[in-house]
Amino acid sequence: MKKWTIEDSQELYNISGWGTSYFGINESGDVYVTPCKDNTQVDLRDVMDELALRDVTPPVLLRFPDILDNRIEKTSSCFEKARKEYDFKAENFIIYPIKVNQMQPVVEEIISHGRKFNLGLEAGSKPELHAVIAVQCQSDSLIICNGYKDQSYIELALLAQKMGKRIFIVV
């Protein structure tokens, strides 16, 4: 029987397919996460062992808000770099499609950290538009209405505009 290697773990977990620079395999063959800018590695096996000691059993959802923050910063800096390189004068807005992840803690983190980066939200359905209006606190942040628009969807978008929201209806 062949001895298990770190490369075997990388292949098994397909780290190169999804891990970017945030996830990897450590010398023990365990998956680790590097959620913070200081490059601290957190061994996920250690996290699960600690949770087991506290009588928390899988499945467990782990969130890494620092990764969300870093992705917003990287996206903004890439667009800003291109804007300067090509002498593009218009302002850049990052738009997060709410359908990607509607979990309240995720959306709140994205909105909170995204404020300084002109981050707006995109809603492709009436339920998504309700959610976006409810969480979008800054009135100057963009709300992009994209998707099927029946009369009630358009009325809701116009009502949000009357409430001071910056609404753009894509036709």
Residue positions per predicted region:
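A general structural signal for short secondary-structure junctions and capping/turn motifs
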Residues: L12-I15, S21-G24, E50-A52, Y86, ...
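A short linear-motif detector with a strong N-terminal bias
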Residues: M1-W4, Q10-L12, N39-Q41, E73-T75, ...
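N-terminal basic/disordered segments at the start of proteins
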Residues: M1-T40
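Residue-level detector of functional hotspots within protein domains
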Residues: D8-E11, G17, E80, K84-Y86, ...
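Low-complexity, highly charged intrinsically disordered N-terminal segments
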Residues: I25-N39, R45-Q102
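Residue-level signal for well-ordered alpha-helical segments
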Residues: K2, D8-Q10, L44-R45, D49-A52, ...
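Active-site-proximal beta-alpha core segment in soluble small-molecule metabolic enzymes
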Residues: D87-V171
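Generic serine detector
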Residues: S9, S16, S21, S28, ...
